Amino acid sequence: MSDYKSTLNLPETEFPMRGNLANREPVMLKSWAEDDLYQQIRDSRIGRKPFILHDGPPYANGSIHIGHSVNKILKDIIVKSKTMSGFDAPYIPGWDCHGLPIELKVEQKVGKPGHKVTAAEFRVKCREYAAKQVDGQRDDFMRLGVFGDWHNPYLTMDYSTEANIVRSLSKVIDSGHLHKGVKPVHWCTECGSALAEAEVEYEDKKSPAIDVAFAAADKVTLLAKFGVEECSGSVSMVIWTTTPWTLPANRALSVAGDIEYALVEFVKGDKTSSVILAETLVESCMERYGVDSHNVLGKTSGQSLELLRFNHPFYDFDVPVILGEHVTVDSGTGVVHTAPGHGQDDFVVGQKYGLEVANPVGDNGVYKSDTEIFAGQHVFKANDNVVALLEEKGALIKLENILHSYPHCWRHKTPIIFRATPQWFISMEQKGLRKQALNEIEQTQWIPDWGQSRIEKMVENRPDWCISRQRTWGVPIALFVHRETEELHPDSSSLMERVANKIEQEGIQAWWDLDAAELLGEEADQYRKVTDTLDVWYDSGSSFSSVVASRPEFQGHDIDLYLEGSDQHRGWFMSSLMISTAMNGKAPYKQVLTHGFTVDGNGRKMSKSVGNVIAPQTVTNKLGADILRLWVAATDYSGEMTVSDEILKRSADAYRRIRNTARFLLANINGFNPETDLVAVEEMVALDRWAVRRAAALQEELLEAYEQYNFHVVTQKLMQFCSVELGSFYLDIIKDRQYTAKGDSHARRSCQSALYLISEAMVRWIAPILSFTADEVWQLLPGQRDKYVFTQEWFQGLKSVTLESDLSDDFWSELLTVRGEVNKVIEQARREKQVGGSLEAEITLYADDALSTALATLGDELRFVLLTSKTQILDLSAAPADAIETELSSLKLGLKKAETEKCERCWHHREDVGQVATHPTLCTRCVTNIEGDGEVRQFA
């Protein structure tokens, strides 16, 4: 026989080396959809313990970006891994569909409501626009391989959800947390509406910073407080502000009761003035004012100045000095200009002293017609006019322009104002909501754990939540208030339920179409309908109730996990916590996981203007979704997540390593039938048993990492296993046995059994992350099985068996190191043309007693481990001077080129080649494998 190729067990598989994911994945998606795979998964977990991950709804506007992809992929990995762990883990995706951004898009097409279209028509257009946006985003999310109930998602604009949002508000009211008040709120003059804290961004803004003098109304009484009888000129209290436009609303000057204040006389040019400043700020103020000289005439506490009065700098009235806890001496003058209508701290201290909440500014940011001097002027344009008037009145001490952080509208990117308006609030204090929420935060697991202190600080400092908006497209605050007293209707709870029933049938338009008499009868004339809409953060924040309570998958089960970007501590996590605590007295979640933002390779935020945006659609179309999924999983999400073309290229390289490992496994279990060919772990060759044992240990580590949501640990350990323990060691060693042993021999079936068991485990390990590739592998695994890996649980066939005769795991680890040292020597010899390959080498191992004894255990099978034709072990002391040093102090090496004949079939150089006359070019081992019972292997 001259052609021995046919006697070899060469690897064969339909699993291609190249993933071609961009083309192959859409075909799989089609198959998953046709088979209703998500429902198959749901059916496979009926009756199991539930795990509920509640989806934070993205906004239904625009294409998804890389941050959306990170979020949805992380959620998908968790849901799939929990399913593999045996949980019933449904995933109901959602969308946030009301609110200003959608209104603005629709306005661009049809104009503002009430102009070319009615408010009702405008809402229809908003609903149509949002639905179209949902369709586009849904396709993009599904392309990522994310499983979920995509064709039955929750939308905050679903009639049933809108109705349930109204019902949740009713429960908040019943619990006593709602109140109406005139309070300063973040107000966007472009939107013409109040903004939630989460809708406010801070950007740098150039503003006029001014020091303004308020002259004493009673100089004599004031001087007496400082123990001074006389001083030159008038005496003024000085404030520092960066919002000159708020001075028309000034109603007080705030000082700190426990701070020492100084009466300072200073000379500048030919003018002498006396001013009151915080003592610790005197020197910095005098330097800022550029005075020629100054002298402290006296000191007193802020407490002693309470209720003294000072003249408004340009209006004909005086204002009191009041004590405020918000006053500091970090900067400025230590005296705070107080306008209760334009600031939260000002409002709080103003309430304490019964100050007027003056609000001279209209919805559009223009002073109202009854505003003295500045009527009709826009506040930001009026800044210069206020400054000019102060200078004219002699009240301006200093003007300088500064760049500082200032609140901006997240949508318009324009500066906002604080403005007192009648609004509806969820109170943080009147029923102890703040205290209760802080307690619930402690009961929740925060991942990473710094999330707890972050949201605690936010809850400790947050004001009452303004939940009302003056918008068209939103869930109505479905209340009736008395026309004269402004009190809620005493039967509000049942009225809201009746309204909710109508909304459930007709949508939110039902509220605006509703004739009050239909519900109130003869009382209708006494009450008016509230026309405000709810903050969209209320919509999404109440979804634990409005959505989860209405889905049969979630019935009777608490939510286990919320997972969003780190910006949601003040967004969705916060609003959900407030509403759930107000309604039910507890947090809506057991765990909260946050991930960082995506940044480019230089750590910069993604921006179209910078040109550093990486669109997920581009990645999936070019590289495939599994590459994107692997990048997400391999990145530590607890910090910023860096992505670039180079990083994705590295992910593609890592993917190829996993794919090549899977391909080797599949190619070498070709023809293997687990029903008839599976060798029990106890009966395997020792090296195969070690590989199964190592895979079993790895599975424990991977499952723990999945359980702790440490997906980067999963990928690191998986890559290590594929590259080192499998690729560089086990798979390399078994090639000879796999290819040359008799096809159905114990030696080969043992090896195939190990490969099969590892394949069964590995396909499940990668399924939550590399979902497309896992499906591709699953379809080619031998044996009877369900159609999809995603209905399976973690593989239970990995037995961690150690026989008395087995070499220890420590030995195999040491052998892996020895093999690495041998490989280095052979590789050097190849570079120097001493040998053509490892099988041309004969290796001598000079080892100390302990290592010699261990290596000798393998007998002739040591050569198979080292991939050489011949090995011999000698005592370390016998090493010649030219023996090659290794990293191991217990080992030196010698290498020479084999002088024996090369076997045509196995390529080993052996002395017994040609001993069998019928096969003159083969070694006796190969003859046994062709014509006999096959070689016997014990160790490798």
Swiss-Prot record:
Catalytic activity: tRNA(Ile) + L-isoleucine + ATP = L-isoleucyl-tRNA(Ile) + AMP + diphosphate
Cofactor(s) required, per the database record: Zn(2+)
Gene Ontology CC: one annotated term: cytosol
UniProt binding sites for ATP: 608
Motif ('KMSKS' region) on chain: 605-609
Domain of life: Bacteria
GO MF annotation terms: aminoacyl-tRNA deacylase activity; ATP binding; isoleucine-tRNA ligase activity; tRNA binding; zinc ion binding
Cofactor note: Binds 1 zinc ion per subunit.
GO biological process: isoleucyl-tRNA aminoacylation
Chain span(s) of sequence motif 'HIGH' region: 58-68
Annotated EC: 6.1.1.5
Signal peptide: none
Intracellular or extracellular location(s): Cytoplasm
Assembly, per entry: Monomer.
Described purpose of this protein according to its UniProt entry: Catalyzes the attachment of isoleucine to tRNA(Ile). As IleRS can inadvertently accommodate and process structurally similar amino acids such as valine, to avoid such errors it has two additional distinct tRNA(Ile)-dependent editing activities. One activity is designated as 'pretransfer' editing and involves the hydrolysis of activated Val-AMP. The other activity is designated 'posttransfer' editing and involves deacylation of mischarged Val-tRNA(Ile).
HAMAP family membership: Ile_tRNA_synth_type1
Name of the protein described by the UniProt record: Isoleucine--tRNA ligase
Originating organism: Shewanella woodyi (strain ATCC 51908 / MS32)
Gene that encodes it: ileS
